[in-house]
Curated annotation (Swiss-Prot):
GO biological process terms, semicolon-separated: DNA-templated transcription initiation
InterPro entries (alphabetical): TBP, TBP_archaea, TBP_CS, TBP_dom_sf
Keyword Transcription regulation: yes
Organism: Methanosarcina mazei (strain ATCC BAA-159 / DSM 3647 / Goe1 / Go1 / JCM 11833 / OCM 88)
MF terms (GO), sorted A to Z: DNA binding; DNA-binding transcription factor activity
Family listed: Belongs to the TBP family.
Transmembrane segments: none
Alphabetical list of Pfam families matching this protein: TBP
Sequence repeat spans: 8-84, 99-177
Name the UniProt record assigns to this protein: TATA-box-binding protein 2
Gene (UniProt): tbp2
Length: 183
């Protein structure tokens, strides 16, 4: 699939690192942490190597976003657990990390006629209102992803749980456009 290989833009994952957190303690110990419960019920903490951001909640749950691959998610969550342990906050060992969403981009390297694609894919499978949004929204059942198709030939795939889901979504689009003679 060299002509349309994906680039992962964002991985969102969640885990439970403890039974509960005192977010004011974490905010006071983690440089750059932001916590204002009047504005948002969680603490925001950004890391740079690898780059990611955390939303940390009093329930002990943590959401990691901004990572560029699944391995980085595991790395930064492991680093977060170590940092919490270093300030005396006990964390769970081997927490289960669940990927919630992967956003990826791809390029078909050709100009696309979105009106023809909308008709070809069937209006029941797509949303296309160019006055409101320049892309065609295509919901695929297998893999269960949403692909935004742009006239530039660029694609954005969202909803995947694995990089393979995103690759498969791009391949489904490529095959269908090819079958319609639109590639």
């Amino acid at each position: 699939m060299s002509e349309s290989s994906i680039k992962i833009e964002n991985v969102v994952a969640s885990t439970k690192l403890a039974e509960e957190f005192d977010l004011t303690v974490i905010e006071s110990q983690f440089e750059g942490a932001e916590y204002n419960k009047q504005k948002f019920p969680g603490l925001v903490y950004r890391v740079s190597d690898p780059k990611a951001a955390f939303l940390v909640f009093t329930s002990g749950k943590v959401v990691c976003t901004g990572a560029k691959n699944v391995a980085d998610v595991h790395t930064v969550i492991g680093n977060m657990a170590k940092k919490l342990n270093s300030i005396g906050i006990k964390t769970m060992e081997n927490p289960q990390i669940t990927v919630q969403n992967i956003v990826a981009s791809a390029d078909l390297h050709t100009i696309l006629n979105l009106n023809a694609i909308a008709i070809g894919l069937g209006l029941e499978n797509i949303e296309y209102e160019p006055e409101q949004f320049p892309g065609l929204v295509y919901r695929i059942d297998e893999p269960k992803v949403v692909v935004l198709i742009f006239s530039s030939g660029k694609l954005v795939v969202t909803g995947g749980k694995t990089p393979e889901d995103c690759e498969s979504g791009v391949e489904v689009v490529r095959q269908q456009l090819d079958n319609m003679g639109l590639l």
